[in-house]
Amino acid sequence: MFRAKERASAMNIIVYAIPFFVLAIVLELFYGWIKQRNTYRLNDSISSLSLGVLSQGRRFVTLGIGAYVYHLITVYFSLPLMDASQWYTWVLAMVIYDFFYYWLHRMGHERTILWAAHVAHHQSEDYNLTTALRQTSTGFLLGWVFFIPMYLLGIPAEVVVTVGAINLVYQFWVHTEHVPKLGWYEWIFVTPSNHRVHHAQNDCYMDRNYGGLFILWDRLFGTFQEELEKEPAVFGIRGALKSWNPVKALTHVYVEMFQDSWHTAHWRDKIKVWFSRTGWRPADVAMRFPREKTDLSQFERYDPKVPPLVAIYGFFQLVFVALLLNLMQTNELAYWHGFAGWGVLLTTAVTTAFWLEGRPAEKNVNWEFLRLAAVLSILVVAGPSGDDVGNLLFATSYGAVNLSFLWFLSRKKHATGSVPAV
């Protein structure tokens, strides 16, 4: 099937890259400690990586229209297919893909409905390699439209998705504060320096540097901004999220659009809200429900303090969802099994966020027992392992460790103190 082949090509590259991602994160963390310039906080990193896990797991619960449209175009409307065995097909596809990625990325900042899908990637107020893995779960809704021309041009599907995966993997390493400007390389390619600009909320850096592989598009279309020594980047978004909850991270702009559309008295504005330039609001709604203006001179990162054991528990749950996702990806699952597995990923990420936000332990423990009972039932009945015994062992091991944590967390003496940045 067209869609199965398309998925497998991209997924394999990303899955193979994961061990290198983990190693690079460890090395960056170690380097920051040595240089006494740590750029990691455990709570922010758990939040970013949890969103990355949900993004990768999203394919188990969605049926994207994009692949079907691509198939129709390839069969009925495209130019003759290019030869995927020729090197120039791949080079051409790489350049063309990045060109359309530039416009997707740019519109993802300039149009509210596309910003709603992209905003999760920018919410981190740290800038490190885990930020690169902080991905949306809703980009599939409209992002595919921008790459239709590649299929019309006759570029084979396996080439498109492969160069897309390579483009995505390339972007991983540019999410770091530790790499300085790179001379001539800055003129052609996306680098850590010019991508730091992209993630900053400073006035002079806003809405700049959209390229994925090549920075040439930004220079050509007037959206390039060099990183300035006199203007240190302040990372994050205007109107900070102030939450580790992945559901809020993925939906808050959609919710804001819906609220503005609902409250405005003008029918034209009810539609315009969704497709307007980012930041625009109906005048009557902006007057009735004003939003707080961002003052970067008073900026403080969202960083609720929690007991050390809570932080360790959060890391344990991150390891669990990452392991579960890996098992889901390496085994053929029935659709409802995949759907149930993604539900486990989501509920675990949400309850972990409750802990990391510093909510009272007694309330969290009650929610955790409910979640754990549901999770263990799903793991036994519809687990990701290839056999029932494997599912039972996986569920038993996870349940035993989880219950041990909850026993300690329910004791008041372990619910005090706080943990600093990693």
Question: What are the roles of these predicted feature ranges?
Answer:
Residues 26-46:
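Membrane-interface helix-loop junction between the first two transmembrane segments
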Residues 51-64, 132-139, 305-316, 365-368:
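Select subsegments of transmembrane alpha-helices in polytopic membrane proteins
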Residues 9-22:
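Hydrophobic transmembrane alpha-helical segments in integral membrane proteins
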Residues 14-17, 126-130, 173-313, 398-422:
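Cytosolic/stromal cytosol-facing helical appendages immediately following the last transmembrane segment
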Residues 301-417:
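Substrate-recognition/cap regions that form aromatic- and gly/pro-loop-enriched pockets
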Residues 53-62, 84-246:
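Membrane-embedded catalytic scaffold of the fatty acid hydroxylase/desaturase
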Residues 11-12, 62-81, 144-160, 164, ...:
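Juxtamembrane "helix exit" motif at the C-terminal ends of alpha-helical transmembrane segments
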Residues 1-10:
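Short, Lys/Arg-enriched N-terminal segments with co-localized hydrophobic residues
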